[in-house]
């Protein structure tokens, strides 16, 4: 029965992602917002809902390893797994402004989380405290404000001759209510389907006696990132690879700054199962994204390298679990 549910949930994931991206593209055309910003603000935040749910429940149950491990693992999978898979089939192109702001911002919050979690500033036990969380929440608000402000400034700088093209895009977008319905409906189907998938996968893993830290870094992290994977592939299929990148970067920032920021307000997140290696791999993932994207394009072979890094990290976790 579990296998039937897994197959049905995968079908739901595919259809939900397609509707979510289609609706998001229409909204982007209506408001003349860049694909990257829509990917970060609507798709990235929306598809991170499963991560928020898992981390909140982990915090409420006093299981910081699940709360933090879910975010760290998801962020690693987002870059190495999702962008790796997407770039292998569809080279990901994006604007140089994203290389100057959003991606470095993502590197910065990843480093900051590591410093907070390892208590670099006060030298006590590994813990993301309430003050740390408030700082992270403020950083998320700053990121969203700057993203939309910079995008608006860019639009105002567009030359007059490009306006007709933008208007034609807006006309093709269709009624706004249909776009909003697609986003809400697609996101609902996507999250529900992913929830079914993760629940079944975790039950199977626990039957083999796997610990919480390992499950949160692998099965839960990858499972809750399935919406991002499906949305990124759907965006790439629609020739919106910039939206796919925005989805990943926005999701990573949202996961750290808002999800862990809010979760730490429920209870300080003291974690011992998530190691320095896990945080280092998370930082290395976004640094690799910056390095590969210096020419504003992630090539197919670079996608292969990213995905191989994910396989290597997963193998490390498996061998460490066995040991």
Where are these regions (language model features)?
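Hydrophobic alpha-helical segments, chiefly the membrane-spanning helices
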Residues: 1-323
């Amino acid at each position: 029965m579990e296998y039937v549910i897994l197959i049905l949930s995968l079908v739901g994931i595919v259809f939900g992602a397609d509707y979510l991206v289609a609706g998001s593209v229409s909204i982007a055309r209506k408001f003349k917002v860049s694909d990257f910003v829509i990917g970060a603000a609507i798709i990235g935040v929306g598809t991170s809902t499963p991560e928020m749910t898992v981390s909140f429940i982990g915090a409420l149950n006093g299981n910081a390893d699940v709360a933090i491990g879910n975010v760290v693992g998801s962020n690693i999978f987002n870059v190495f797994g999702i962008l790796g898979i997407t770039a292998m089939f569809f080279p990901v192109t994006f604007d140089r402004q994203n290389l100057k702001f959003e991606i470095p911002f993502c590197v910065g919050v990843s480093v900051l989380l590591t410093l907070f979690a390892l208590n670099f500033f006060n030298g006590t036990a590994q813990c993301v405290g309430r003050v740390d969380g408030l700082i992270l929440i403020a950083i998320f608000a700053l990121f969203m404000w700057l993203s939309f402000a910079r995008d608006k400034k860019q639009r105002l700088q567009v030359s007059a001759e490009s306006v007709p093209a933008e208007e034609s895009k807006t006309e093709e977008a269709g009624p706004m209510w249909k776009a909003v319905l697609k986003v809400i409906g697609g996101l609902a189907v996507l999250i529900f389907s992913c929830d079914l998938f993760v629940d079944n996968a975790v039950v199977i893993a626990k039957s083999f006696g796997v610990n919480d830290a390992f499950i949160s870094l692998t099965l839960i992290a990858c499972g809750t990132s399935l919406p991002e994977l499906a949305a990124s592939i759907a965006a790439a299929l629609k020739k919106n690879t910039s939206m796919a990148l925005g989805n990943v970067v926005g999701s990573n920032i949202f996961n750290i700054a808002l999800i862990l920021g809010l979760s730490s307000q429920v209870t300080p997140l003291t974690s011992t199962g998530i190691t320095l290696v896990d945080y280092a791999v998370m930082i290395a993932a976004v640094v690799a994204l910056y390095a590969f994207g210096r020419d504003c394009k992630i090539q197919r072979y670079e996608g292969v390298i990213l995905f191989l890094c994910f396989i290597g990290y997963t193998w490390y976790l498996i061998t460490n679990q066995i040991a």
